């Protein structure tokens, strides 16, 4: 096993060097889109055998990382990375029912995002999100009367919270953390045991069940999960509260999906809202806004579980052998219309 892990490590280094050379050439000759297809050649690494045998989860029981040898199934700090085939979904469902959990899902639908995305998001969530569980959909919008009526199953409710309309789309994104922190300290935080926060411009395409639950949950970004850490788009402006020095950072996480217990998310949203306020007071704005601060938080406070890109996939990337069953799919963006 040690020899196998060593060979995988050398293979990973070799392919990174090849990719870098081909990538630089590709950038000059063909442009960036051609380069994207080469990154799938980089091996993701292998979970050490000592860690692999110890991977367990409160909802899925013993995990099966050996069922996915082609992908990385654990983090350096011993948290599982959840891939299709690495867990028993029936065990997770049974455990969640025994605990009689209520799971919250927050969605911000502001401006044209409401009319373009919200209805499909909610309809597909009813098919795939925590099926058979008690669920609270918390929709935050400046137009509560425009929220579509969606047929909900037993034990599932859809409270709507009014929020102020922000002037810029960047401010909408960044105000989310402050609003979530307040909500988690109020009624939503008392109603739900676990909470997920998701972007509305995506839709469910497969089962998103209790296997995703943990004290704190991060989502690998589908555009960056093959990249070495030094190429990841962390905030590098040393003056920003989200700044991460070169050499810091392990995975790049997507702010379109994150979750955890109410207490853990209170800490996460307090950190991100505080960092955003710090930057604003100094006339700064992190490159990727609240996502930059989210990644800084998960660097300082490691998540208990990481979801593979299968749980939030971009169809623009195209098919990948390791992406067996996408759970969420990004919707076409149309930023020029939506953000005007």
Curated annotation (Swiss-Prot):
Membrane keyword on record: yes
Any one of the GO CC terms: vesicle
BP GO terms, sorted: carbohydrate metabolic process; glycosphingolipid biosynthetic process; lipid glycosylation
Membrane topology field: Single-pass type II membrane protein
Cited Gene3D superfamilies: Spore Coat Polysaccharide Biosynthesis Protein SpsA, Chain A
Family assignment from sequence similarity: Belongs to the glycosyltransferase 6 family.
Organism: Homo sapiens (Human)
Major place of residence: Golgi
Enzyme class: transferase
Taxonomic superkingdom: Eukaryota
Protein name per Swiss-Prot or TrEMBL: Alpha-1,3-galactosyltransferase 2
Residues with glycosylation annotation: 58, 100
GO terms for MF: glycosyltransferase activity; metal ion binding; N-acetyllactosaminide 3-alpha-galactosyltransferase activity
Record-annotated membrane-spanning stretches: 13-32
Cytoplasmic side: 1-12
Gene: A3GALT2
SUPFAM superfamilies: Nucleotide-diphospho-sugar transferases
Keyword Phosphoprotein among record annotations: no
UniProt binding sites for Mn(2+): 199, 201
UniProt subcellular location: Golgi apparatus, Golgi stack membrane
EC number(s) given by UniProt: 2.4.1.87
Keywords of the record: Glycoprotein, Glycosyltransferase, Golgi apparatus, Lipid metabolism, Manganese, Membrane, Metal-binding, Signal-anchor, Transferase, Transmembrane, Transmembrane helix
